[in-house]
Structures are given as structure tokens and as C-alpha cells.
Amino acid sequence: MSEEPRNYDLESQDTTERRYAYNFDFDVMHPFMMRSFESFFQDGSLLELGSFRGDFTKRFAARFDDITCVEASAEAITEARDKLGSKANILHSTFEEAALERQYDNIVLTHVLEHLDDPVGLLKRVNHEWLAKHGRFFLVCPNANAPSRQIAVKMGMISHNAAVTPAEKEHGHRCTYSLDTLERDAVAGGLEVLHRSGIFFKALANFQWDRLLSTDIVSQEYLEGCYQLGQQYPDLCSSIMLVCERGKV
């Protein structure tokens, strides 16, 4: 556990070494995540755990009318409420303290689990308390084995694929998952893994992608090619994904 209370507002701020979120996340990864989720969505309600400033939530709002969000950063919630209005019910709480009095047909946790001091504890709450009997849980994390990270290892910038860099630590990262360790924690939380995949083959760092996206060098067809290649090689993707159902409770 952390020795000092965590400041979630501070953790979500950009630093000199690393932005908390990049245009690559918003403009490339979010649409491809939605595409990866679509065939597994259940009709009904959606719970987003860690909504940040509401950018991804806006995409869910085009698909769902019943959305609840839980977010620990008060500053992020203020911005999210400005963006979303009445389209989502946003609760200011940590996951450990969240009191949700219902279950949800879809639960989404994207690029959040790696921030948690007790990831398995949250996954147990998802399985035992919040996920409906026939619901789906969508779990996405940055991938330790993404080629961009492996290249950074070969360059001597980080020690090993699953390292947590100082800049990532400033942003609240506690670990870096690969498909095997992500599934390990999902199973430890009691969940049944229905589907495993990767999202978007990625050989460049996020800041490099942002610079490319500001030019006309990268076409939509190239982005589509990276997405399709990622379906063939999930372990070499930017993000890894599990779709889970409720296990024994």
C-alpha cells in the first residue's frame, strides 16, 4: 500500500517528462477500443470506472442512455460534468470507498487497473458486487510488451518491458501489465475470461504518434492496418484487452 495519501488531482496532471493523456489516446485508441468492445456490449446500463475528464464517456453516451461513472479526481470530474451534462451520473469516490447500490450490464475499466494499489481487490468488487449476472466487463491496460516499450528497453531508456518508469510513477502507475499477468489478476478476482485480444500494433511512443498525427504522413488506411495487425499479434499491441463475465460469487 502507499505510504502517503494519494493526490489523484496531482497524479492526473501533465509533467515535463510525460503527458497524462495524448491525442493518440483520444483520436486513435478510443475509437479502436470502442470498435473492439462493440460486438461484446450488452444492452442496458454501463458503469465506467475511472472516467477522467469524460472524453471516452462521450463515446459511450452515443451508445448507452444509462451511464454511471466513478472518478477519484475532483478536478477531472468538474471538466467531465461540463462535457457530459445529464448524459452520465458521475460519482466522486475512490473505488475502494464507492457505494453502488445496483448492478450493471456493462462495466468498463480502461487504463486504470495499473494505477491501483490493490487491483485484485477492485476486480473482486466488480465480480461480486457490480457486474450483473449476464453482464460483461471490459478490462484494458497499456501493454508491457508493446514494441514501443521493447525498443525503449533496447535503447537503455527503461530496464525491462514491465518496468514502471519514473514518469509513469508520477502519474500513479503501480505496475505494467502483459496479457499473462492481466489474466492472472482477472482470474484472482473471480472473473471468467471470455475473450482476450490486443488493440493497435504500436512501434512508436505516444509523443511520437502525436507529432505524426499533426502531419499528413499517416493515413486512415495506415491506422486501420495497425489495428488489423494488432488482431493478429495481440502481444505487440499498444493496449491489451480482456472481456470477462461474472464468475462464481
How should these model regions be labeled?
Residues 84, 130-133:
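A generic alpha-to-beta junction signature in SAM-dependent methyltransferases
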Residues 65, 132-135:
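A short helix->loop->beta-strand "cap" motif at the edges of active sites that frequently abuts
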Residues 111-115:
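Short catalytic micro-motifs in class I SAM-dependent methyltransferases
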Residues 1-110, 123, 198, 223-225, ...:
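Conserved N-terminal segment of class I S-adenosyl-L-methionine
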Residues 3-8, 16-28, 55, 117-129, ...:
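S-adenosyl-L-methionine-dependent methyltransferase catalytic module, highlighting the catalytic core
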